[in-house]
Amino acid sequence: MNATPASRVTPIGEHEIGAAREYFVGLHTRLSDAWAALDPGSAQRRDEWQRPPGDVLSGNGRLSLIENGAVFDRAGAAFSDVSGARLPAAASERHTELAGQPFRAMGTSVVVHPANPYAPTSHANVRLFTAREGDVWWFGGGFDLTPVYPFDEDARDWHRAAKAACDPSGAGVYAALKDACDRYFYLPHRGETRGIGGLFADDLNDTTAVTGGDFDHCFALIRRIGDTYLSCYRELLERRRNTPFAERQRDFQRLRRGRYVEFNLAFDRGTRFGLQSSARTESLLMSLPPRAEWRYDYQPEPGSPEAGLADYLKPRDWLS
């Protein structure tokens, strides 16, 4: 996603920022309630936190977490609205003119690690960043799917839903956001994507080449991304949550979760932003699976379902 210099962005005010916050809080509540209803026997926790002015970051947030359930090994959803005096390097590397300036960042993120190896891991995030008291702003967001045992049906449904979320914003938006997702969620040291992709949008404002449009136009796309994630992933989860599995599948699931950890800690910009800005550590590490494994020179048996996963860990047109 390409944007022109930040100084050309049409400013926004507290009304627009408040509308975005209201949506992010509501999405967090809907996600938290949906996962809790799916796994009522699990260990569930909901926290609210606040950091006073004077800290490196000030603001507030909410976190919901489900662990050790019949459906979820871990499912977390987090909302935060924080302000800082100096923009961290992870957020200013593509906006050098904003380096070291005050900022405000808010959004909702969710990561789900299902118990059943046939149910895919998922991630979604929607966010708004502002600086210079609203003179500079951009939305970001997207979702991606990381199966251990992939199904073509699931991949096609996922990408159909992604395209439907993008189409009202323009004919080329899905293709651009899908390509950005394939490029972002990539492990260069492994030579593979994190999963089968989805959507990835950053720097969305009225100067963005692909989407264009004013605040309302960009905000509508972000809302469709958040709403589509919840409805589509819940359907896939219901479809696969009761598939029979054995210890072999759980073993491979732990190995693949190791790759998930590698990406989040080594490459994810959101994690780097949080670490550089002294964000809440528990919220940052919520995205990691509770159990992962690394095995020296592991090679799946040729011709096995485990070996077949490699064919899915590369960009593919799922809608042709």
Task: Outline where the language-model segments fall.
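Compact, glycine/acidic-enriched structural inserts
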Residues: 133-177, 320
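Glycine-rich, often proline-containing surface loops adjacent to acidic residues and nearby aromatics
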Residues: 75, 104-106, 137-144, 192-216, ...
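Internal mixed beta-strand/loop scaffold within catalytic domains of large alpha/beta enzymes
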Residues: 61-140
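Mature, function-bearing regions of proteins
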Residues: 66, 70, 78-102, 146-152, ...
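Long, charged, mostly alpha-helical binding arms that flank functional sites
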Residues: 165-221, 235-238
